Amino acid sequence: MLEKLIILDFGSQTTQLIARRIRELNTYCEVYPYNKLPEDLSGVRGIILSGSPYSVYDSKAFRIELSELRGKLPLLGICYGAQSLVHQAGGKVEPCDSREYGRTHLTLRQPDDALLTGLQSGTTVWMSHGDTITSLPEGFEVIAGTEDVPNAAFRIRGEKTWGVQFHPEIYHSEEGTKLLGNFLDICGMKRDWTPASFIEATVQELRERLGDDKVILALSGGVDSSVVAVLLNKAIGRNLTCIFVDHGLLRKGEFERVLQDYEHLGLNVIGVNAKEKFFAALSGVTDPEQKRKIIGRGFIEVFDEEARKLKDIKWLGQGTIYPDVIESLSITGMVIKSHHNVGGLPERMNLRLVEPLRMLFKDEVRRVGLELGMMPHLIHRHPFPGPGLGIRILGEITEEKATILQNADDIYMSLMREWGLYDQVWQAGAILLPVRSVGVMGDERTYEYTVALRAVTSMDAMSADWVHLPYDFLAKVSNEIINKVRGVNRVVYDISSKPPSTIEWE
């Protein structure tokens, strides 16, 4: 049985960073909403309680009865999680005079404590809280503190329960990963979850789950669906039929290039031209969420139609990855934006879903692909959304706009490769804005579209920083697009990071 750690999410923006750090330590973990702890805890070796935007005293704060968890499994509370342990046990948590945010130095009071093994006294940690623990309940003891936060870390005597008021998952906490590793050792984790072990377990699981059933797989040309294709092919061979849909919103020349790539992989691929269907369905639609749902529904309908042409197809494969799942539903149940792989699907489907990468982050998918021996140019391609340029054309989608954006995007990507910037950027693309502006070309006044350029660096799509591309490069791209793409007379560069912005505009 796969051993794992569970992270209970109380709404923190850094919950997924906790998961990333744990995965980096070759340990499998899963994130669950704070009130959705699985009843079956077999295989679970420990639990981490995340931070939260709330105070323990807020009426809307996310609460569970922590006494029911204490003593059963090793427990680590981070920030709000630590404060909740103290508050529920009768200790004092009070507002800070001013919010404590940023770097500080941690003094170890009990350096021999199992959670602090190997840490240096004075190590830098990252604080981010508005409340602080001022008094610990009986049975709780301080193991580390800072100048302003004397109870920065504690443990409960006689239990494998700890709390820290700083954030070990944040990069600025110098030895945060070491602390999390110590907790994994306390939990008795083997730390043997690797790409090779994932492939072995997943292929075995797919064979058991699918048996002799036939599967069709949604191909996009991106790394996610490519890795899924190779995994499924390894598990069930010719029982896999890959479906690649041209919805008219792919990058320029993408349809032909992708078909060629997959033929080289020995996959059974059917190419479907469904441009007219998608453009007709999207006509007049401007709402981003509605567009996503239409595109998602269109995909499933096309797959359903293709499945009927084939015999005995029972499963639909998809390249859903963990950030897709996490982004689709917030902790409160409020939709952030539906993802094309996990939202926008019709209620009735004639096929069951199989999503082998559902619990992997993007960088983990790439490592799995390399372990599978896939071609580097497939593995290191920039992420490209399933709805394609459909979520990069703001406002109504038309075939004319799609052509404009394809041409602009092609210039941007080609120059990025030419300048040696492509592999330095995690994701890049052009966006067609629903904004026309006045320009002058030759002696004539123009009134044409604006294109925005986007380029970000990221590890896992949960957070992203905009890339400081050279001005000379941006000037070259702008000049080429304006001169060569009919319908565009202005180019701008997006300098927004995630959060608060998302990577895609819609």
UniProtKB/Swiss-Prot annotation:
Residue intervals of the GMPS ATP-PPase domain: 193-381
EC category name: ligase
GO MF annotations, alphabetized: ATP binding; GMP synthase activity
Disulfide bonds: none
Pathway per the UniProt entry: Purine metabolism; GMP biosynthesis; GMP from XMP (L-Gln route): step 1/1
Span of domain Glutamine amidotransferase type-1: 4-192
Enzyme Commission number: 6.3.5.2
Catalytic reaction(s) noted: XMP + L-glutamine + ATP + H2O = GMP + L-glutamate + AMP + diphosphate + 2 H(+)
Protein name per its UniProtKB record: GMP synthase [glutamine-hydrolyzing]
Organism of this sequence: Porphyromonas gingivalis (strain ATCC BAA-308 / W83)
Gene transcribed to yield this protein: guaA
